[in-house]
Design a protein with these regions (language model features):
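Two-component/phosphorelay signaling modules centered on CheY-like receiver
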Residues: 10-31
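Helix N-cap/capping motif at the beta->alpha junctions
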Residues: 18, 32-41, 62
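Short amphipathic alpha-helix used as the core "switch/output" element in two-component signaling
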Residues: 41, 63-74
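Receiver (REC) domain active-site loop signature in two-component systems and cognate sites
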Residues: 57
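Basic, amphipathic DNA-recognition helix from helix-turn-helix-like DNA-binding domains
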Residues: 72, 77-135
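Short, Lys/Arg-enriched segments at the junction into DNA-binding effector domains
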Residues: 116-175, 181
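DNA-binding patch around the recognition helix
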Residues: 126, 131-134, 158, 202-232
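Positively charged, aromatic-enriched patches within helix-turn-helix-type DNA-binding elements
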Residues: 155-159, 165-215
Length: 232
């Protein structure tokens, strides 16, 4: 279910958008406002996934509303739907942080397609970030950005891409033994290669030193088998 806030001063268009998306297409919970001031209040109270807004509205226009929202909320998807079609208007919207600009007139199916494409993209980005972020004792590994964050001290350490790859594999299989050749294959695209194996030992020693701040965390060597990230 997509929670959608429509901010539109045209009563008939607002009704058509709400009815079509909520009742005909389905999968939407639609909240409506008639101007930017009401839109800001609804955004605060309802916390929508998507805001679809006109620009030329009374009290606070679309530009003013988005500027206010983007001061504290960079996540909500914002789409302008407007008859203002000059390049300057379009550029102004994107400078403020909107995600898309649909020129009036348009049909509800077009709006639905834009909304769902942006929601899918946003959820995919969030899923990727969450998938590659791991809690390891007092640490948080962000494998996407090769950083290790100490939640206790607030210190952030940049590690190498290879170190991030290795720790990522171990964190995915926390408290389980991961075969050395599996790590070598994923990180170096080789199996039991001597030089890659020695490089792995060097990286493991560096990671052990980085994780030493938390006694409950350690990387164990299981002789003849592989490595194990142990956490309590």
């Amino acid at each position: 279910m997509i929670k959608l806030l429509i901010v539109e001063d045209d009563d008939s268009l607002r009704y058509i958008e709400k009815t079509y998306l909520e009742e005909i297409i389905g999968g939407y919970k639609v909240i409506t406002s008639t101007n930017g001031e009401e839109g800001i209040k609804a955004w605060k109270n309802e916390k929508p996934d998507v805001i679809v807004a006109d620009i030329d509205m009374p009290v606070i226009d679309g530009f003013g509303m988005v500027e206010h929202i983007r001061e504290t909320d960079k996540e909500v998807i914002v789409i302008f739907t407007s008859a203002l079609t000059s390049p300057n208007d379009v550029k102004a919207g994107f400078r403020l942080g909107i995600n898309n600009y649909i020129k009036k007139p348009f049909v509800p199916d077009e709006l639905d397609a834009h909304i769902k494409a942006l929601v899918k993209l946003k959820r995919g980005e969030r899923s990727t970030v969450e998938k590659n972020t791991y809690q390891i004792g007092i640490f948080t590994l962000d494998a996407n950005h090769s950083t290790l964050y100490n939640n206790k001290t607030g210190e952030q350490t940049t590690i190498t891409v290879r170190e991030a790859q290795i720790l990522h594999i171990l964190a995915e299989n926390k408290n389980e033994v991961v075969r050395r050749d599996a790590i070598l294959d994923k990180c170096w695209s080789v199996g039991n290669d001597y030089f890659a194996s020695r490089s792995l030992d060097v990286f493991i020693n560096k990671l052990r030193k980085l994780l030493a701040a938390d006694p409950s965390v350690c990387i164990k060597t299981v002789r003849g088998v592989g490595l194990q990230l142990v956490t309590e």
